[in-house]
């Protein structure tokens, strides 16, 4: 077994948001035999590509990485069904399937997640309906605590199946997943961006959702009972020209020192972040393209593959929670007042209409999901306590796959 023991003087960021650091022992099993030997250990977690925002990928003792389990086991191009080991990255799946006329039916905001991580977190995307990966999974193979390989489907070993999707590895180690793909004619996306300047206009614009496949909403400002931002809608281009089924040409870049320095200033300053959001909203509609590339639409944050570094050594935390529609305006106004009074801010606030049934640890319910990226600074503790008070007051469901601030209550 290949062991990496982190040096005690070096703190290692265990999640993408960089808000928790430790020096764990990390094991990279190369095959099933080595993995079974490790399963006899206690107090460890399974990790994929460690792109989680929250603390669900954190263990200060032992981490078992599935990065060596990176084979695509089967791809049926005719039926649009793929089976891949849990360590395979989504970007590698897309590189294989998109040029043949298929795409994943649900995708998070980054291609650099592992298949096992997508299942364990039951990822959701911009889809207006069937918004979670659970709707498209056909079969899972799990190595349980007894070192038995369990095959489960929606009808076979159903409890294992339902508990594993969104279960954060509590049922065992996900070995592979088989899921249904979505047929596409092009990697191009038809998109529409509409500006809203009030709650009424926001709700009115959302009525257009049935004309599209995807929607996400970006908040620029919310204050004194008002709200401003942009609604993004999209659907796959139906042009049947085969030349549009081409490989990705999206070139990722790393943030260099100069850009890092400038961006860090903007992500740490209350007034500059407000100015940036205002400028973005005003000019985005002018320069946006009616037809967008696949990567531009689904993975804009991957343009800078190390964008998380702009928050500095303390990192940030992402709060994502689900509020009922009748409480939405009240909660947004309370958050706005808190941010204004404390001169604190969220660099991004994303709102999405949400309607999912579920159970166990899954993120489900009906209403609006609110997602905020908040830099960790001197106001962190006060912000955390405020959000927890909101969670409790309104009995709000928190997305555990991204959470690192919710208290036990």
Predicted regions located by residue number:
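Structural signature of FAD isoalloxazine-binding scaffolds in flavoprotein oxidoreductases
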Residues: 54-73, 127-147, 173-180
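Substrate-recognition/cap regions that form aromatic- and gly/pro-loop-enriched pockets
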Residues: 292-408
């Amino acid at each position: 077994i290949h062991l990496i023991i982190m040096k005690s003087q070096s703190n290692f960021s265990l999640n993408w948001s960089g808000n928790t650091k430790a020096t764990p022992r990390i094991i990279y099993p190369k095959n099933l035999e080595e993995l079974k030997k490790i399963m006899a250990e206690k107090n460890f977690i399974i990790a994929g590509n460690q792109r989680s925002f929250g603390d669900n990928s954190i263990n200060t003792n032992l981490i078992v990485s599935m990065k060596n389990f990176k084979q695509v086991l089967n791809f049926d191009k005719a039926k649009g069904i793929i089976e891949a080991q849990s360590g395979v990255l989504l970007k590698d799946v897309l590189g294989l399937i998109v040029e043949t006329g298929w795409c994943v039916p649900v995708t998070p905001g980054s291609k650099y997640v592992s298949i096992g991580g997508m299942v364990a977190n039951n990822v959701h995307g911009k889809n207006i309906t069937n918004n979670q990966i659970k709707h498209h999974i056909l079969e899972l193979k799990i190595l349980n605590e007894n070192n038995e390989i369990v095959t489960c489907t929606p009808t076979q070993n159903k409890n294992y199946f339902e508990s594993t999707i969104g279960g954060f590895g509590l049922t065992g180690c996900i070995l592979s997943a088989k899921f249904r793909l979505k047929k596409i004619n092009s990697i191009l996306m038809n998109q529409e961006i509409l500006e809203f300047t009030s709650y009424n206009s926001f709700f009115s614009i959302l009525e257009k959702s049935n004309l599209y496949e995807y929607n996400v909403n970006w908040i620029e400002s919310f204050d004194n009972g008002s709200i401003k931002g942009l609604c993004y809608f999209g659907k796959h281009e139906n042009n049947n020209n085969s030349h549009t089924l081409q490989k990705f040409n999206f070139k990722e870049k790393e943030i260099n020192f100069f850009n890092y320095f400038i961006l860090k200033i903007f992500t740490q300053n209350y007034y500059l972040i407000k100015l940036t959001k205002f400028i973005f909203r005003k000019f985005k509609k002018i320069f946006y393209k009616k037809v967008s590339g696949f990567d531009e639409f689904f993975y804009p944050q991957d343009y800078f593959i190390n964008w998380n570094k702009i928050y500095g050594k303390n990192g940030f935390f992402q709060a994502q929670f689900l509020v009922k529609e009748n409480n939405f305006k009240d909660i947004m106004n309370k958050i706005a007042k808190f941010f204004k009074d404390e001169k604190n801010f969220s660099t991004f606030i994303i709102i999405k209409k949400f309607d999912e049934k579920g159970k166990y640890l899954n993120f489900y319910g009906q209403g609006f999901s609110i997602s905020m990226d908040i830099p960790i600074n001197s106001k962190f503790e006060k912000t955390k306590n405020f959000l927890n008070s909101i969670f409790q007051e309104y009995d709000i469901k928190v997305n555990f796959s991204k959470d690192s601030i919710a208290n036990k209550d």
